[in-house]
Amino acid sequence: MERREEQPGAAGAGAAPALDFTVENVEKALHQLYYDPNIENKNLAQKWLMQAQVSPQAWHFSWQLLQPDKVPEIQYFGASALHIKISRYWSDIPTDQYESLKAQLFTQITRFASGSKIVLTRLCVALASLALSMMPDAWPCAVADMVRLFQAEDSPVDGQGRCLALLELLTVLPEEFQTSRLPQYRKGLVRTSLAVECGAVFPLLEQLLQQPSSPSCVRQKVLKCFSSWVQLEVPLQDCEALIQAAFAALQDSELFDSSVEAIVNAISQPDAQRYVNTLLKLIPLVLGLQEQLRQAVQNGDMETSHGICRIAVALGENHSRALLDQVEHWQSFLALVNMIMFCTGIPGHYPVNETTSSLTLTFWYTLQDDILSFEAEKQAVYQQVYRPVYFQLVDVLLHKAQFPSDEEYGFWSSDEKEQFRIYRVDISDTLMYVYEMLGAELLSNLYDKLGRLLTSSEEPYSWQHTEALLYGFQSIAETIDVNYSDVVPGLIGLIPRISISNVQLADTVMFTIGALSEWLADHPVMINSVLPLVLHALGNPELSVSSVSTLKKICRECKYDLPPYAANIVAVSQDVLMKQIHKTSQCMWLMQALGFLLSALQVEEILKNLHSLISPYIQQLEKLAEEIPNPSNKLAIVHILGLLSNLFTTLDISHHEDDHEGPELRKLPVPQGPNPVVVVLQQVFQLIQKVLSKWLNDAQVVEAVCAIFEKSVKTLLDDFAPMVPQLCEMLGRMYSTIPQASALDLTRQLVHIFAHEPAHFPPIEALFLLVTSVTLTLFQQGPRDHPDIVDSFMQLLAQALKRKPDLFLCERLDVKAVFQCAVLALKFPEAPTVKASCGFFTELLPRCGEVESVGKVVQEDGRMLLIAVLEAIGGQASRSLMDCFADILFALNKHCFSLLSMWIKEALQPPGFPSARLSPEQKDTFSQQILRERVNKRRVKEMVKEFTLLCRGLHGTDYTADY
């Protein structure tokens, strides 16, 4: 078959291949791909074959690769190449060759009907692609023609083979449509055409499915074909007969999975809710599966119960609103709801004995939303019917959330335990949501059950039952304000009565107390009921996460009521810290808890507690500072510094972030004298410097030191002022010796908080000039090895311009060198560094008028900046960064318009810049668009996105849709 040759480069293959795209070379490359043990050779072969598939020669070798004497792998490649040529390069096929191409594909499909199935499928996909490209004008009755041609009696292939080939073709046609690259307007036309053609497909499918003589393989294929077609949003009423046939096929174990898929796909179409009469006919069909469902559950047949549950949930979840509206059919819908309830409460533990119940959870959200969306009168009626259902749901969910016996749980794999944990979180979310429907009565219900369980003397209760009820409370209290609930005092009273003999139960008790910490803040008299439990649990490593996080919540929420317990809390915490019971992260949380606790004490008390709390660590740090650096003492140093920084993160006597009401703040006198954190920092400052002197070349230790001061600065704000001069001096020495990003980040914090204060400007200016000078030297030596430093440096410069532009007025600051280094940073491969550099320029350019040195350097070197930006847009930088470069263009246009209008024309003049794919007209249009837009930043971003796609040859491709 003749083919018009494609233009060179149409395939996008890049440089000319070393080998010609011939049948022989393709076969050799395929052999290399499948059988060569060398991975590099495989990759080369794959790359070459991808080029071959899109080459003009593919039209010639594809047909030859389909010859009967070739092995299936080679035939498959030939069929795939045909599909790629037809689907991606349709415009290269002359219209007068459509018919011969169609005929050849039909011939090949007929031949492969009794051959390799994978090759047959690829050929069917190729013909489907051709049909979609020709419909509706060039091939108006494509589907009907396919059916007619394959039903012809004169075919050499047996009837069953032809039937299966036709069904394969009809199955892949809608699938190919869903993934096709058809333009949007064509997609609409073809969808309409396919909807009409459905009339040629469904009668055939019905006939084949209902014929007793149809073999199982044919009926299986019919169901898959139906499943594929319903996703074209075929009207549900047109599918009635096939859906009923699919329900009947559920009794056949071989057809069960395909039937489920077909029914679920048909029911789940968004358009299906319009066909209420059909939906109502489906309810009895679904309810008719209940006996099969019960049998499956009884026999442990998880596949069958899972499939039937999917069908029930698909109908209920997708159409609850439409079915609720049919008031006269309320009983049949309620029966469906109860069937789904059975699926939610299916016996056994998830995920070991069953995997079905999790499918139903979203249904309960949907049903509740739909009920609550009705107007008040109608809602009241439905609430009357469905509130008892939702109370039953709570019981079912809490039963499903119960842990298995300790013995059984011990046999579960770690993966099964993790799946069960996630399942319980999903149940927790559902319970929290159900609270909206049931309100305070739900908490009363849970409390009554727990009370009866704990006070009953008749029978011993299982810890699992207690744990599940507490878990229900915790789920609701964590996210919903229960402060006005009248059952919480009783619950707090019940908690100490729980006999805790199990880690899971103890964990849930802890998390429940934590969830009630805000309530405890409003009812401080109850703190003493639960605090001893929490402090006792701190000593158990198995309860590490729950006990520490609960103590942290109590200390944060109730700190003004904790002074009477402070000594005990500090003593217990010190004890567990010294015994090293907890992992590092929990130790850090514990220090944060103590920071909250100490914040509410008198200054003298804080200092006393701080002394006893951190003295052992200071002594340990003094000892470590004398030792020769090694990996083990490094870990100890980082741990101690981490403990201090976490303590100082939350120790805030000025209550900057406090949202408590005035009366509670008045409990504390206004603090006099220096801040306790500053007192401690000044005491340990020399020691920290000593540690630093030995560990200056270790980024982790430097980072840990900087973290102490950075977190203290963020918490203390102005109270940190006494430390500013000595910290600036220390940072300067640190950074001069070995530059580290963390030192720059801390400098940025100091600039942000203190640079605007005249008293602190001199030391901060000196530090700023020093780190700038050191970093500029680093740029001369090779900054590419330090993207983190460059990133932090750019952020520091931007902060300086934003907070205190006067820092750029100093004659000792080489603004020109800073500007050039920032331009260089724009070309880094690391996205965060590029982003930070763009941020610097968007802060710098608006200062052109007010800071003389900035205006001068922009005038001299601004063209260099523009070229770097255009190079990035032209393809040098990631497309995800285009908004950042657009911000620079916008700033240039807004603040340096006359310069930009001259530079942009000059910069875009050279052919091939910033991309060889651009025409002079496209470049001219872009420059005019940019220069015109000085107000709307969003429009500039859109222009840049459009232009970068043109530069990269991606405009009008599939990439554009996701961009």
UniProtKB/Swiss-Prot annotation:
One of its GO terms (molecular function) is small GTPase binding. Expressed in fetal brain, heart, intestine and kidney. It holds the Pfam family Importin_rep_3. Residues 45-111 form the Importin N-terminal domain. It is found in: Cytoplasm; Nucleus. It comes from the Eukaryota. Keywords: Cytoplasm, Nucleus, Protein transport, Repeat, Transport. One of its GO terms (cellular component) is nucleus. The keyword Cytoplasm applies. One of its GO terms (biological process) is protein import into nucleus. Its main location: cytoplasm. The keyword Repeat applies. HEAT repeats lie at residues 24-54, 56-88, 95-135, 142-179, 194-231, 236-268, 276-325, 330-372, 375-438, 440-476, 487-522, 524-558, 562-600, 603-648, 676-716, 720-754, 761-803, 815-845, 860-893, 897-931. InterPro entries: ARM-like, ARM-type_fold, Exportin-1/Importin-b-like, Importin-beta_N, Importin_beta-like_NTR, Importin_rep_1, Importin_rep_2, Importin_rep_3. SUPFAM superfamilies: ARM repeat. PANTHER family: IMPORTIN-13, TRANSPORTIN 3 AND IMPORTIN 13. Interacts with UBC9, RAN, RBM8A, eIF-1A and PAX6. Functions in nuclear protein import as nuclear transport receptor. Serves as receptor for nuclear localization signals (NLS) in cargo substrates. Is thought to mediate docking of the importin/substrate complex to the nuclear pore complex (NPC) through binding to nucleoporin and the complex is subsequently translocated through the pore by an energy requiring, Ran-dependent mechanism. At the nucleoplasmic side of the NPC, Ran binds to the importin, the importin/substrate complex dissociates and importin is re-exported from the nucleus to the cytoplasm where GTP hydrolysis releases Ran. Belongs to the importin beta family. This is Importin-13.
